[in-house]
Amino acid sequence: MRVKGPSSKKHKKKILKLAKGYYGAKHRSFRRAKEQVLRSLQYEYRDRRLRKREFRRLWIQRINAAARLNGLSYSQFMHGLKLAGIDLNRKMLADIAVADPETFTKLAEKAKEAISQKSAA
């Protein structure tokens, strides 16, 4: 005869612990809890990847808004920085745009200079 004792109990206890805080039967019933925990883990996996995309979009929006206050579009600003040899990633640029607008204005001026020098040459 097959004994399902300790390991079965341990497995169920683990699932119900992961389901703590869920609404209704999803934290009481093992079957419902298991379904919800599996779904939650899928969401967690998917959203770890989506988070990276969403933050990049947010940084680009912030940089674009700050660049437009300085008379440049996002693409012109980024191109100007590349021509000027300024190598800052989007996260850093977005932080500068929010926390230190004066520095961002100086970066925008450098980008404008680099663009005008390239077009003059």
UniProtKB/Swiss-Prot annotation:
Query: By what name is this protein known?
Result: Large ribosomal subunit protein bL20
Q: Say which species the protein is native to.
A: Persephonella marina (strain DSM 14350 / EX-H1)
**What GO biological process terms does the UniProt entry carry, in alphabetical order?**
ribosomal large subunit assembly; translation
What is an example of a Pfam family matching this protein? Answer: Ribosomal_L20
- Recorded coiled-coil stretches: none
- GO MF term set: rRNA binding; structural constituent of ribosome
What family does this belong to?
Belongs to the bacterial ribosomal protein bL20 family.
- UniProt cross-references to PROSITE patterns, sorted A to Z: RIBOSOMAL_L20
Q: Which UniProt keywords apply?
A: Ribonucleoprotein, Ribosomal protein, RNA-binding, rRNA-binding
Which InterPro entries does the UniProt entry name for this protein? Ribosomal_bL20 (IPR005813), RIBOSOMAL_L20_CS (IPR049946), Ribosomal_protein_bL20_C (IPR035566)
Instruction: Explain the purpose of this protein.
Output: Binds directly to 23S ribosomal RNA and is necessary for the in vitro assembly process of the 50S ribosomal subunit. It is not involved in the protein synthesizing functions of that subunit.
A cellular-component GO term for this protein: ribosome
